């Protein structure tokens, strides 16, 4: 486990040290692997101070190095870079309760969360990501992508009601409101990737899926397969040759289509899913701390 030392430009007061001591085991990202850093490279403040777009901050956060605050020594913090497979005590910085077995990821702060900024020193503030279950992180990404796509071709007054509904998420009895969408280059890239991927899936998937569904229904007469077959039969028309024996060239072409479709599905998953950093082994009684295995 690597140690990272963070030195502050400002003298830490007793109150500052007391505040930091209450933040032991908090996850703090840093831009890159360095043994010694300044407070300017600690946490998300360098990003959130200049950019308020959730998608942009999320994309930068995905590239950052995870560390865990271990202790305060004088005017510096001692951070540990976790090792895969090892157990660590992790502080819950998110609004949602954790449960044993949860997979956890990191997301940018939400504007409705009251503990986004934990310590202020001069012009600098300690801003950390929220550690949340991957399921809610994916739901947030999906909703933001949906809002962005709707906003591209709808008038504001036409979509306001549905956007208000999409922006409110209740998860484990906790209600949050999503940040505002900024359709900048980062968001537009996500929407473009989603549209290109969906276009290719729409163009290539129906024929090959229909072929496999037809074959599978001969072996398995489940109602779900039959319903899928009926749905596809309304959308696609297959030549009788497709049901016969495939030539080598046809098989190669078919394989390319399958790989392309799966690649496009993976592209969409990359827009909505977040990687797992921790798996919860045990949770404290107040749900503010958990023993977790580092998985990244």
From Swiss-Prot:
It is found in: Virion; Host nucleus. Pfam families: Herpes_V23. Keywords: Capsid protein, Host nucleus, Virion. GO terms for molecular function: structural molecule activity. InterPro entries: Herpes_capsid_2 (IPR002690). It comes from the Viruses. The keyword Transcription regulation does not apply. GO terms for cellular component: host cell nucleus; viral capsid. HAMAP family: HSV_TRX2. Structural component of the T=16 icosahedral capsid. The capsid is composed of pentamers and hexamers of major capsid protein/MCP, which are linked together by heterotrimers called triplexes. These triplexes are formed by a single molecule of triplex protein 1/TRX1 and two copies of triplex protein 2/TRX2. Additionally, TRX1 is required for efficient transport of TRX2 to the nucleus, which is the site of capsid assembly. Belongs to the herpesviridae TRX2 protein family. Interacts with TRX1 and major capisd protein/MCP. This is Triplex capsid protein 2.
